[in-house]
């Protein structure tokens, strides 16, 4: 990154439109799920032999981490999401817009984080609805925001390997 300040058009902030699309799609899907599906296992919709739509509340983080706590975790995870969103937006402002890979990764994480924060602040929980399973083993239910966060993080990790390989050549 150069020392010269980038304009908004030149910087990765241009890619925040993707975060907005992810956020709007996430809350839109969650709205449909909350208003059209019954809550819980008995109301699941079997789609494929390994996939259900299932409306559940997650009071914790990934894998329902800390979901059994008294409620303080809601604000902890909200605070973490705000800090991460701020840092990633700052980094995007320093990255040239042409560095698509990292800007897309950051925008995906921001969109997902803001989608889940919206749920935490408005509802007190995150709405999850995707249930993948094999036999009797079910992966923890998740949502579009979770997928965006994970894919963005995977892109950042892959970029770290990609840059090392390029440096060796």
UniProtKB/Swiss-Prot annotation:
- What subcellular compartments does it reside in? Cell inner membrane
User: Which pathway is it part of?
Assistant: Protein modification; lipoprotein biosynthesis (signal peptide cleavage)
Q: Name one Pfam family in it.
A: Peptidase_A8
Q: Can you list the GO cellular component terms from the UniProt entry?
A: plasma membrane
Q: How does it sit in the membrane?
A: Multi-pass membrane protein
| InterPro entries listed in its UniProt record | Peptidase_A8
- Positions of the catalytic residues: 128, 146
Q: Which domain of life is it from?
A: Bacteria
Tell me one GO biological process term: proteolysis
Which family would the database say this protein is a member of?
Belongs to the peptidase A8 family.
Function according to Swiss-Prot or TrEMBL: This protein specifically catalyzes the removal of signal peptides from prolipoproteins.
Annotated protein name in UniProt:
Lipoprotein signal peptidase
- Native organism is Vibrio parahaemolyticus serotype O3:K6 (strain RIMD 2210633)
Gene name?
Answer: lspA
